[in-house]
Curated annotation (Swiss-Prot):
Name of the protein: Uncharacterized transcriptional regulatory protein YxjL
GO biological process: phosphorelay signal transduction system; regulation of DNA-templated transcription
SMART domains in the cross-refs: HTH_LUXR (SM00421), REC (SM00448)
Domain of life from the UniProt record: Bacteria
Keyword terms, alphabetized: Cytoplasm, DNA-binding, Phosphoprotein, Transcription, Transcription regulation, Two-component regulatory system
GO cellular component: cytoplasm
Modification type 4-aspartylphosphate: residues: D58
Length: 218
């Protein structure tokens, strides 16, 4: 197996769902399915044994939920990227997924090309929250008063930094953010750098999760 490929583990209690994901992922030249599990306990054991780059995690599974499994895996393997993939587009699952350390939240009816893009983005350390509910939560979070998390910041976000941070939460890259906000890519890079400094984050995902969490915990 090519070590340069993104190693993806699948966690879903429905064999047909795993088969579909496996087919789509293994058809790519830059990624491969490194293992599969049908319940929460098995994906925890599999992850600790094989250390995949990305895990596609169903929420509702036997013996241990995807959320609980994600918490366990993230405590042992903080560099593993977990994407919650489910049929349930609810605020509860979005919140719980974020708290568990997931970097993404997608629906199972996501188009194959969007799924592949999300896996690549997760492997790069980017956050992907593209469901209607996740987008709504993120938008509400960034409309909230900055006092919500001001005490934890070295200095408050500027209006433009909040706009950039919101686009980061949608999974957009610097060039896409620049086009959307009508600024140069170098300007976006400067904003991203300042955002990471202000929330003491090592990467984009940490910055996004910090912002969302501080909008949730009022």
């Amino acid at each position: 197996m090519n070590k340069d490929k993104i190693r993806v583990a699948l966690a879903d209690d429905q064999p047909l769902v795993r088969e579909g994901f496996r087919y789509v992922i293994n058809a790519q030249t830059d990624m491969t399915v490194s293992g599969e599990a049908g319940d929460g306990h098995d994906i925890i054991a599999l992850a600790k044994q094989t250390k995949p780059d990305v895990i596609l995690m169903d929420v509702q599974m036997p013996r241990c939920s995807g959320i609980e499994a994600a918490k366990d895996i993230m405590s042992a393997l903080p560099n593993t990227k977990i994407v919650i993939l489910t049929t349930f587009d609810t605020e509860e699952y979005v919140f719980e997924g974020i708290r568990a350390g997931a970097v993404g939240y997608l629906l199972k009816d996501t188009l194959p090309e969007e799924l592949i893009d999300a896996i690549r983005a997760a492997a790069r350390g980017e956050a992907i929250f593209r469901t209607v509910t996740a987008a709504k939560i993120i938008s509400e979070t960034f409309r909230a008063k900055q006092q919500t998390h001001a005490e934890e910041l070295a200095e408050p976000f500027t209006k433009r930094e909040l706009e950039v941070l919101q686009q980061m939460a949608y999974g957009l890259r610097n060039e896409d953010i620049a086009e959307k906000l009508f600024v140069s890519e170098s300007t976006v890079k400067t904003h991203v750098h300042r955002i990471l400094q202000k929330c003491n984050a090592q990467d984009r995902t940490q910055a996004v999760v910090f912002a969302i969490r501080n909008g949730i915990v009022q």
